């Protein structure tokens, strides 16, 4: 496949056109008065959204050189989304502004590498200023404010605040589509996993179709339970104790299952059996988690423990177990706080050390089950398009709220960046083109506020000048079109989101500015024409 190559200013200008096309599509959504973008889908109806990263992901440009620029700036949005979960539009607008200012100076003879050094130094200084200005987020009201700003919806903000307050910072908040019109919050206490009873005959609550037991013993077994003679001695000890039994094993088969069912129907023993969730190492790890939660021991032949010899001392216990057709919940296991804290600390270390996003996600789920709980926000809406748009906003709000709890908040609406730019007034003591790099970033930091104001129908330049004169913490509230104390008004952004936007925008802009050539594949038709059949005279 033959290639096309562009060099120097021509290459950089092509990249800039790509950056501009993507950024111009995204930045109309910035701020509380930002507009929506409609995305056509290959299947199904169109999606209407104001979520920067969702828009960026859809954009592929026809011109291959411009497309390179668009893909580079798309990576700013996705990276910011991965780290902070929100702030993708801010990051895109910043990258565009740094690229534009940088290219202007390169065309006037500035050295791209020196500019890059200045841009880096400026980004580091801005991050330092943001972290210094951060206020910790405490309490449901503060969390709800962050979520409200992110989602532009007070109801969503309140719900996210409630969810995170209930499950804690380690808890999991998942967002699902509801089959009704209402948006609701469902909190699960205790440890829950997606496996239900092996037989409907275990049900104790016929109306709810669930097996519900109080003060139950919990048997954790790593293999299949198939032999009744091996299992009977333990079953008899449980029957003598008079307590109900929850069995979690790889499987319970044959005569063991039928014996449990018959005894449950006759009420001679209260028991319910479920399969252990997951496979392989994940199943082993999850059973170990359950052992910590219930204060029991996982019985398995690897460590010399067999069912035949097991006593009640190896069983865990829980204040309440609820088993439905699809899921099992263990509430208030008998594990000690110290053991659970130790296990949580171990999982945190594993999360820090893993390189795999998938592994990290699964470890975080396990951590949430152990440490906090699980909250599900079920999003409802009148139409499918509306539902998708609302779900995007709820997901952004959850991510923003978590980021705020992690690193604190700064005044929102782009004001924190404008005020952080004053830290760059002396060009950080740098000279020449490095100082020019700092100046490029200083000017670019005005861009998010400029576009928030422009999208609200005001003159962006006038608003940025006014905000620069305001005291720290004060700025422009685009929702009410007033100036004032943004923290008091609840117009706040998570530091993590703003910081990630600055770092990622500076990084990608530097790459574009220091590009001297761009190589792309030649479009297929051109290749065919050149190697074409036939002959000319």
From Swiss-Prot:
GO terms for molecular function: ATP binding; ATP-dependent protein folding chaperone; isomerase activity; unfolded protein binding. It comes from the Bacteria. One of its GO terms (cellular component) is cytoplasm. It is found in: Cytoplasm. CDD domains: GroEL. It catalyses: ATP + H2O + a folded polypeptide = ADP + phosphate + an unfolded polypeptide. Its main location: cytoplasm. The keyword Transcription regulation does not apply. GO terms for biological process: protein refolding. ATP binds at residues 29-32, 86-90, 413, 477-479, 493. Keywords: ATP-binding, Chaperone, Cytoplasm, Isomerase, Nucleotide-binding. Its EC number is 5.6.1.7. SUPFAM superfamilies: GroEL apical domain-like, GroEL equatorial domain-like, GroEL-intermediate domain like. Forms a cylinder of 14 subunits composed of two heptameric rings stacked back-to-back. Interacts with the co-chaperonin GroES. PANTHER family: 60 KDA HEAT SHOCK PROTEIN, MITOCHONDRIAL. Belongs to the chaperonin (HSP60) family. Together with its co-chaperonin GroES, plays an essential role in assisting protein folding. The GroEL-GroES system forms a nano-cage that allows encapsulation of the non-native substrate proteins and provides a physical environment optimized to promote and accelerate protein folding. This is Chaperonin GroEL 2.
């Amino acid at each position: 496949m033959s290639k096309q190559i562009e060099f120097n200013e021509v290459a950089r200008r092509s990249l800039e056109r790509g950056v501009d096309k993507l950024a111009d599509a995204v930045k109309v959504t910035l701020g509380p008065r930002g507009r929506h973008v409609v995305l056509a889908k290959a299947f199904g109806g169109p999606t209407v959204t104001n979520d920067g990263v969702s828009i960026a992901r859809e954009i592929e440009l026809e011109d291959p050189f411009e497309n390179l620029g668009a893909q580079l700036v798309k990576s700013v949005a996705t990276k910011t989304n991965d780290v902070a979960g929100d702030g993708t539009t801010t990051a895109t607008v910043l990258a565009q502004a740094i690229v534009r200012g940088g290219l202007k100076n390169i065309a006037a003879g500035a050295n791209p590498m020196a500019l890059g050094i200045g841009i880096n130094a400026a980004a580091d200084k801005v991050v330092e200023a943001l972290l210094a200005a951060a206020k910790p987020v405490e309490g449901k009201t503060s969390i709800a404010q962050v979520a409200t700003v992110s989602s532009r919806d007070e109801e969503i903000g309140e719900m996210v605040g409630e969810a995170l307050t209930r499950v804690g910072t380690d808890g999991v908040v998942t967002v699902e589509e509801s089959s009704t019109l209402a948006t609701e919050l469902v909190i699960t206490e205790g440890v829950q996993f997606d496996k239900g009873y092996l037989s409907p005959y275990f049900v104790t609550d016929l109306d709810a179709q669930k097996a519900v037991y109080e003060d139950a013993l919990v048997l954790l077994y790593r293999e299949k339970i198939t032999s009744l003679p091996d299992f009977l001695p333990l079953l008899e000890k449980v029957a003598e104790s008079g307590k109900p039994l929850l069995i979690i094993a790889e499987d319970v088969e044959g005569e063991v299952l039928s014996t449990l069912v018959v005894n449950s129907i006759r009420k001679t023993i209260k028991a319910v059996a479920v399969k252990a969730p997951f496979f392989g190492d994940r199943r082993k790890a999850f059973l170990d988690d359950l052992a910590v939660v219930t204060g029991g021991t996982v019985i398995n032949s690897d460590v010399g423990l067999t069912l035949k010899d097991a006593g009640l001392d190896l069983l865990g216990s829980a204040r309440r177990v609820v088993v439905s057709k699809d899921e099992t919940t263990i509430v208030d296991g008998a594990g000690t706080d110290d053991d659970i804290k130790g296990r949580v600390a171990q999982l945190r270390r594993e999360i820090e050390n893993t390189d795999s996003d998938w592994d990290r996600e699964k470890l975080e789920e396990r951590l949430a089950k152990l440490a906090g709980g699980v909250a599900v926000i079920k999003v409802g809406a009148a139409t499918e398009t509306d539902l998708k748009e609302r779900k995007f906003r709820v997901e952004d709000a959850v991510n923003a709220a978590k980021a705020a709890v992690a690193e604190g908040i700064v005044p929102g609406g782009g004001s924190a960046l404008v005020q952080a730019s004053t830290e760059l007034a002396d060009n950080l003591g740098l000279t020449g083109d490095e100082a020019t790099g700092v100046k490029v970033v200083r000017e670019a930091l005005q861009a998010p506020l400029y576009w928030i104001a422009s999208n609200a129908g005001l003159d962006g330049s006038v608003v940025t000048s006014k905000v620069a004169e305001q005291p720290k913490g004060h700025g422009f509230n685009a929702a009410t079109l007033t100036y004032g104390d943004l923290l008091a008004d609840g117009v706040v952004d998570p530091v993590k989101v703003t910081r990630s936007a600055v770092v990622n925008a500076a990084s990608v802009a530097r790459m574009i500015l220091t590009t001297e050539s761009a190589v792309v594949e030649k479009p297929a038709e051109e290749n065919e024409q050149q190697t074409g059949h036939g002959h000319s005279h």
